[in-house]
Amino acid sequence: MASKITGKGSFRGVPFLIEEEQGLDGGRRIVSHEYPLRDEGLTEDMGKRLRRYQVSCLVIGDDHLAQAEKLIDALEASGAGTLKHPYFGTIEVRVDDYRAKNSTNHQRVTRFDINFLPAIEKNAPEIAEDTAYSVLSEYQATLNSLSDEFAEMVQDVSGFIESMVDNPLFRLADTTAAFIENIFEGVANTVSGLTEVKDKALSIKNRLSNLLLTPKVLAYELQQLTRLNVRSAVNSQRQFVQHIVITDSISSALGDLTATKNEISKSTLDEMVTAKTNNVAETEILARQFKNLHEQEIFDALMNKTTFLLKRLVLSTLAVEYGKAISDAVTESVAQKTVTEETIATLIESKTDVQRYIAEVDEQLEAVILDNADAEQWTSYAALEQYRLTLMRDLQIRGERLANAIEVKLNDTYPAILLEYRHTGNSKTWKRLALRNGISHPLFCLGGTTLEVLQ
C-alpha cells in the first residue's frame, strides 16, 4: 500500500506545509543555430539541464511571522542544505530564490514560493597535478644542492691546505685529475661508445687549475660528465644497459680508490671552519683536531676528504640522472597514444616495466641518500630524499596510464603477427611484440616459450 502524503516538509530542519502545486523543471540544454538568408539551421545538445525544484509552501498559526523568519533565515544561510519533501524525498539542495507572501484575506498564514537547485559539488573539471613537471623542477634543484654543498666543502678543505703547502691549487688539481683519470677515463676504456666521455674528461683535466678557483663550476662540469642522454627510443634501451655498466664500473673504481682511506667527518670540518672564522690560526686548529697525526698525515687526510667529496658527487648525480631518464622514458611511452606498424618499442611500455624500474631507481637513490647521511652532508641528503619522493609519486601516477602486460605460454609455434592479433586485436604492432620478447625470427614464436604481450 502506498505511503500517505502528509503534506509536511522541512528545510534545514525548519518545518513547513506544502500547498496544492509542486513543480519540477528539467530537460536538455539545447542551443539552436539559425543563419540569415538560410532556411535551415541546426541544434546542439550541450548536456543535461540541472533540475529545478519549485516548492509552494506555507507556515500557519498565531506565530506565523516568527515561523516565517526562521524559514527565511534557513533559506538565506550559505551553502547546501537538506530539503525533506513529501514528493521529492530527502535531497541536498541550494536555494536559487524565494518569495514570501502575506495577505489580508488570509490571516495567520505566510506563503512561500521557493526554487531549489541540486547541491552538486564536483561539477567542474578536477585539476590534475603535473607530476612530470614536479620531477623536472626537483631534478634541477637537487643537482644544484649537490653542487652547492660540494663547492662549499671543497672550499673549506682548500683553505686549510693553503696553510700547509706551497701551491695548494696544484696539489688539489693533481688529486682531482687522478680521480677523473681513474674513474671516467677508465670507464671510457672499458665501455664501448664512450669516446665523448673520454674527451670531456680530458677537457676538464686541462682546465682543472681554473676550475678549482670556482668549485661550483667544477661540480657542474663533473655533473655534465656523468649525465645520461636518452636521445631517442631507438637507443634508449642501449643507454640504460650502458648506464648499469657505467654505474657498476664507477662504483667499483670508487670503492678501490677509497677502500684504504679514512674520511674526515663533516662535523670536524665544520668545527675547523668555525674556529678559523673566530680568527684561530690554521696551524693551531689542525694541531688541536689531529693531535696524533704528523703533518703529512694531516695533509693526506685533507686530500682524501676531497676524493670522498668527488666520489659522493658523482654517485649522487648518477642516481639522479637515472631517475630523470626513467621519467623521460615514461613520458615518451605515454605520448604514444596510437600504436601503428611503425611504432618503436620504447624502454618502458607497461605497468610491469614501471614497477621494475621503480624498484631499481629507488634502490640506487636510497644508497646515495644513506651515504650522504653517513657523511653528514645534510643539504644533499634532504634534496635527494625530496627528489626520490617526487620521482616515485610521478612514476606511480603516470605508470597507471600505461598498458597492462600479460604472460602467454605458447602451446604451439605461431607467427608474431598472429599472436599479436589474437591477444590485442591489432596485428600492426607485431614488431613491438618481437622486440619486447627478443624474438629472432617473427615467423617462429616457438611453442613452450612464454611471451609478454601488451594489452
Curated annotation (Swiss-Prot):
Keywords annotated in UniProt: DNA-binding, Viral genome circularization, Virus entry into host cell
Native species: Haemophilus influenzae (strain ATCC 51907 / DSM 11121 / KW20 / Rd)
One GO biological process term: viral genome circularization
Lineage: Bacteria, Pseudomonadati, Pseudomonadota, Gammaproteobacteria, Pasteurellales
Protein name: Mu-like prophage FluMu DNA circularization protein
Pfam families: DNA_circ_N
Keyword DNA-binding assigned: yes
Family per similarity comment: To phage Mu protein N.
DNA-binding region: 368-387
GO molecular function (one): DNA binding
Keyword Hydrolase: no
Matching InterPro entries: DNA_circ_N
